[in-house]
Amino acid sequence: MKLLEVCVDSLASARAAKQGGADRLEFCSALAVGGLTPYADLLRQIKAELDLPVRCLMRPRAGDFLYTRDELELLCRQIETLRSAGADGFVIGALTSEGALDLPAMRTLLDACGGAPVTLHRLSLIHISEPTRRT
């Protein structure tokens, strides 16, 4: 079974995606920087108007996927907020400075998702095995 998922960052783009035949939405803000965590109020608008499943991208800032403890805590709080706002699933990714999946961070995020469907963020896949230095 094929599924058309469209990345959107506004109510207008979500409407266009539905009109174009989308089966599911990946919702984020700031597409120009690869996508950031979206706003809960906008998710509520999309869910109220459109009958499509929505997975929310969880990314606190542009740049790498190396997250501090504070950033992971923020992401967990944002996941809870977006779950309460109607998110059907989440798109996550966290890497180590060596370019491998950060399994403890991923476990923390998966636990926060509470059994909701999860997708690994495509940009984190691009950065796997590319060692990163924090500046």
Predicted features, each with a name:
Residues 1-9, 60-74, 120-125:
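Active-site mouth loops of central-metabolism enzymes
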Residues 126-135:
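Single conserved hydrophobic/aromatic residue that forms the stacking wall/gate
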Residues 4-6, 25-27, 54-58, 90-92, ...:
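Hydrophobic faces of well-ordered beta-strands that scaffold small-molecule active sites
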Residues 32-50, 96-111, 129:
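Active-site-adjacent beta->alpha loops and helix N-cap segments on the catalytic face
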Residues 87-125:
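Hydrophobic, well-structured mid-protein blocks that either form specific transmembrane helices
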Residues 46, 52-101:
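Glycine/small-residue-rich loop that forms an oxyanion/phosphate-binding "nest" at active or ligand-binding sites
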Residues 20-25, 50-52, 86-89, 113-116, ...:
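Glycine-enriched alpha-helix->loop->beta-strand junction motifs that scaffold or abut catalytic
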Residues 17, 82, 121:
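Conserved, mostly hydrophobic/aromatic
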